[in-house]
Amino acid sequence: MQRYPMTPEGKIALEKELQHLKTVERPRITQAIAEAREHGDLKENAEYHAAREQQGFCEGRIQDIEGKLGTAQVIAVKDLEQNGRVVFGVTVTIENLDTEERNTYKIVGDDEADFKINKISVNSPIALGLLGKKEGDEVKITTPQGEVEYEVVSVEYL
């Protein structure tokens, strides 16, 4: 069985979403289906079909979250050996050796990734290229823009 890495914060966020889906969305959709049924003929009842579609999406997401939580490998950065290497959960600053542009990223699980707030998936090309590296290491990473050479500036276990 494949383990699904996530931070403690990521686990809490998924648990909150699951709770919301089960206690708010599921009952709301069930009520919408019941109201749509009262309108009669279900063959041409757009409200009914829309509510059933919402129900399918909601139940699918519930199953998805339950599966991920069931196989979660929660990794707390503070509990890791702080050996200066890039691993899941660390915050890493890298510098593009061509442009001298610096970026700082936190390496997180797939569901936690949000590039707008500099959280990248452990399965992203950048994270995969950085895993195992330490401060001062140079690495070539294939990105959508082509191959880019970076230097690991800092690794923080925050």
UniProtKB/Swiss-Prot annotation:
InterPro entries: GreA/GreB_C_sf (IPR036953), TF_GreA/GreB_CS (IPR018151), Tscrpt_elong_fac_GreA (IPR006359), Tscrpt_elong_fac_GreA/B (IPR028624), Tscrpt_elong_fac_GreA/B_C (IPR001437), Tscrpt_elong_fac_GreA/B_fam (IPR023459), Tscrpt_elong_fac_GreA/B_N (IPR022691), Tscrpt_elong_fac_GreA/B_N_sf (IPR036805)
GO biological process, one term: regulation of DNA-templated transcription elongation
Keyword vocabulary terms for this entry: DNA-binding, Transcription, Transcription regulation
GO molecular function, one term: RNA polymerase binding
Keyword presence, Cell division: no
Family: Belongs to the GreA/GreB family.
Role: Necessary for efficient RNA polymerase transcription elongation past template-encoded arresting sites. The arresting sites in DNA have the property of trapping a certain fraction of elongating RNA polymerases that pass through, resulting in locked ternary complexes. Cleavage of the nascent transcript by cleavage factors such as GreA or GreB allows the resumption of elongation from the new 3'terminus. GreA releases sequences of 2 to 3 nucleotides.
PANTHER family in the record: TRANSCRIPTION ELONGATION FACTOR GREA
Protein name: Transcription elongation factor GreA
